């Protein structure tokens, strides 16, 4: 039986500006199991990224509880987390492999083993042979693949992805969704994937969490009962349409 890996209980987060206070996240309660690929979907600006930053330990929160890990699989903040952002954020003066090893380098992990793992990860994300290239020599999609490899190099237990394919063209985005699913099935990591794309959420997620407009409240969450490995033909299936219509309805768009 799969154990709960992340538990949020009535998490609340507000911000103070010069003119006013505003609530970004309101009483979110959620359980995520080990090895799930959870898609967080909601309108732009609703607080999805704020929730992700709370999980990453980059933001505090006003009240509630956040537990990550369990007795069988303890979690070390900072060490056991990987992040992928909307932009690849590769250092232009470092080769691709030197960008990939950066988190492990910061953590002081053994250099030889780190570079071996980086080469394996670049192979896994389809960038074998590009180790010595520089970021400007790669397309946007290839740079984002390198960013995914970088997020995995220190073998984190949790990977947080904040609209990682939002800046890509539609065709490259579809390819990257397929790539993400393949990487997830190979790595068995717990992944939280933020998107405002409803079809994208259903396609990549083993579970979908639907958030309201700001402040982010959890409207619903459900398992996506579509088989793996997934392919683009699934978007024509009746069940896929049912899931997307469910989300549209939950967001008041139908």
Question: Model-found features: residue ranges?
Answer:
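The feature captures the beta-strand-to-loop junction immediately N-terminal to the Walker
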Residues: 41-43
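Helix-to-loop junction immediately C-terminal to a conserved catalytic motif
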Residues: 56
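Conserved ABC transporter NBD signature motif
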Residues: 64-77
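Short coil-to-helix segment of the ABC ATPase nucleotide-binding domain corresponding to the Q-loop/switch region
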Residues: 94-101
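Conserved ABC ATPase "signature" region
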Residues: 101, 105, 112-130, 182
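Conserved signature/switch motifs of ABC ATPase nucleotide-binding domains
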Residues: 133-136, 154
């Amino acid at each position: 039986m799969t154990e709960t890996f992340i538990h949020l209980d009535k998490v609340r987060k507000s911000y103070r500006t010069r003119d006013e206070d505003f609530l970004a996240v309101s009483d979110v309660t959620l359980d995520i199991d080990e090895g799930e690929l959870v898609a967080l979907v909601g309108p732009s600006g609703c607080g999805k990224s704020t929730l992700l930053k709370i999980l990453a330990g980059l933001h505090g929160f006003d009240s509630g509880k956040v537990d990550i890990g369990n007795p069988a699989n303890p979690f070390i903040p900072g060490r056991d987390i990987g992040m992928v952002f909307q932009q690849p954020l590769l250092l232009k003066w470092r080769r691709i492999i030197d960008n990939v090893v950066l988190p492990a380098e910061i953590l002081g992990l053994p250099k030889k083993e780190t570079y071996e793992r980086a080469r394996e990860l670049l192979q896994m994300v389809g960038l074998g042979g590009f180790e010595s290239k520089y970021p400007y020599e790669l397309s946007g999609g290839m740079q984002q693949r390198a960013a995914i490899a970088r997020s995995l190099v220190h073998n984190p237990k949790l990977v947080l992805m904040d609209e990682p394919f939002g800046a890509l063209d539609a065709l490259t985005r579809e390819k990257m969704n397929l790539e993400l699913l393949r990487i997830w099935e190979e790595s068995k990591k717990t992944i939280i994937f933020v998107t405002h794309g409803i079809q994208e959420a259903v396609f990549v997620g083993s579970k979908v969490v639907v958030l309201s407009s700001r402040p982010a409240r959890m409207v619903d969450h459900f398992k996506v009962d579509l088989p793996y490995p997934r392919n683009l033909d699934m978007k024509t299936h009746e069940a896929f349409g049912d899931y997307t219509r469910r989300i549209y309805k939950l967001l008041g768009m139908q």
